[in-house]
Amino acid sequence: MKFSWRTALLWSLPLLVVGFFFWQGSFGGADANLGSNTANTRMTYGRFLEYVDAGRITSVDLYENGRTAIVQVSDPEVDRTLRSRVDLPTNAPELIARLRDSNIRLDSHPVRNNGMVWGFVGNLIFPVLLIASLFFLFRRSSNMPGGPGQAMNFGKSKARFQMDAKTGVMFDDVAGIDEAKEELQEVVTFLKQPERFTAVGAKIPKGVLLVGPPGTGKTLLAKAIAGEAGVPFFSISGSEFVEMFVGVGASRVRDLFKKAKENAPCLIFIDEIDAVGRQRGAGIGGGNDEREQTLNQLLTEMDGFEGNTGIIIIAATNRPDVLDSALMRPGRFDRQVMVDAPDYSGRKEILEVHARNKKLAPEVSIDSIARRTPGFSGADLANLLNEAAILTARRRKSAITLLEIDDAVDRVVAGMEGTPLVDSKSKRLIAYHEVGHAIVGTLLKDHDPVQKVTLIPRGQAQGLTWFTPNEEQGLTTKAQLMARIAGAMGGRAAEEEVFGDDEVTTGAGGDLQQVTEMARQMVTRFGMSNLGPISLESSGGEVFLGGGLMNRSEYSEEVATRIDAQVRQLAEQGHQMARKIVQEQREVVDRLVDLLIEKETIDGEEFRQIVAEYAEVPVKEQLIPQL
């Protein structure tokens, strides 16, 4: 732990108090010898004079400049000497002569000044240390959340400021999103060489909005901009503007832009801007809440009456649909950069970046991993290689092999591996269910190719069948949707065909949900039914984002009944397609089930080779190479 004088002083405060009292006890008296010459009793000055005249005083010791005396008194009744303390008057010059005339031994003890000096020093230092400790204690409590000093800082911006950002990330570390990187590299060039653009009348963009699903590299791009630009950099989260007090959000926005103007040219990065930039409207909560005041102030600062030349705002969100239209217009966010999931070449570049510090076995191919992971984001790919490295270390291997890569992909997609099932009727039923999915998907031309079938439980699933879609396809046809419905019904069809209608299980619950959703979208959104080419889905918006409290139905009860009938018809059509394939291919289904129970996992290529011995396997648009 780092040493702190302030903490040491606070902890020493109780010791100072105790030490002060010990100090006072040691140097409290003006005369240290007075404590060693103690008296048994006290005697009045008048009685003392009487004893002097009577000859009962044998010795007198004077202390405190003659103000106090310790006298020895002889008592003939008990035949012993007593010591008594006498307080002497200030004006008694004849006393000394009187004592000498009576032949009484007289000693004078001078005052020791060192005790007074140390007492004075102790009395001075202790209050100073006490006041300093209390001051530091107050300062520390004021800096803590909820401390008394926080009331003065609520309106201050919480943005992290770096005069020369050291993020450790450069554009060379960002891979797989070349289009977005090119857009942002131009922003950096604007800041470094503005004359190139002003010479032809171009203006620097005021804002860039990074849009994309989670894990695609939006924040990483912002770090790269900060590392490359070489200008002051402010970073803040959208949720850090609004607090429990009214007006704090708007005040923090003003303070942020005030600091930015003082350090222009500079960059401001607002992460998760949807926390403060959601669209305004009635909805629930009214139209005058604290978030809207903060948004209004942000709109004014970005492009209001006063300019903010030299300030570029970069924001990131994965919810562009909820942002206010005034925030999205040119002049505030001039550019909207889409940061989407990478394609094959992008995934390959990302994997190469994250594999720099990984020790891969010679047989591991980055190209094969990239082809096997369509739809993976940059964060997913980084997690995949990290999981593979962890598995390698757990298994005490020196390099990451194909087995670790395969297990890591399964873990990222489906979750942790569970305990394998024991041989039983339940295991055989699950095997028929998974083979049913795979056989239907393999024999339907428009279905995605099978990647792997396994009985190893992962997550909530007791068995899994992976299909790898063709990532180059941006649109989906009706035939492909029907093939997916049939493939999803393949598990239930195999259960019915092999075990009978009374032995079907709840394992198809998720499949039926998926089938119903696809069929309903075909009817209500895509116009792929007998109802005709119309869209019947309402888009009233979410209630907390300014939408209505209740979505209004756009069609009559009669149309709703027809929609339900069409959904049921499409689902039943897919069910019959799957049932027919399972019936016709029962022999190969039984063989595949026996093989799956024996090996617990069959990869896609082996599965297709076995099916090809019994039926013609249609050529898919893309077959995924296996690792």
Swiss-Prot record:
GO molecular function term, any single one: ATP hydrolysis activity
Residue ranges of the TM segments: 8-28, 118-138
Keywords in alphabetical order: ATP-binding, Hydrolase, Membrane, Metal-binding, Metalloprotease, Nucleotide-binding, Protease, Thylakoid, Transmembrane, Transmembrane helix, Zinc
Cofactors: Zn(2+)
Protein's cellular compartments: Cellular thylakoid membrane
Topological domain ranges for the Cytoplasmic compartment: 1-7, 139-627
Lumenal compartment residues: 29-117
Residue positions of the active site: 434
Quaternary assembly: Homohexamer (Potential). Part of a large (>500 kDa) complex that includes FtsH3 and PSII. Coimmunoprecipitates with YidC.
Record-given protein name: ATP-dependent zinc metalloprotease FtsH 2
Species for this entry: Synechocystis sp. (strain ATCC 27184 / PCC 6803 / Kazusa)
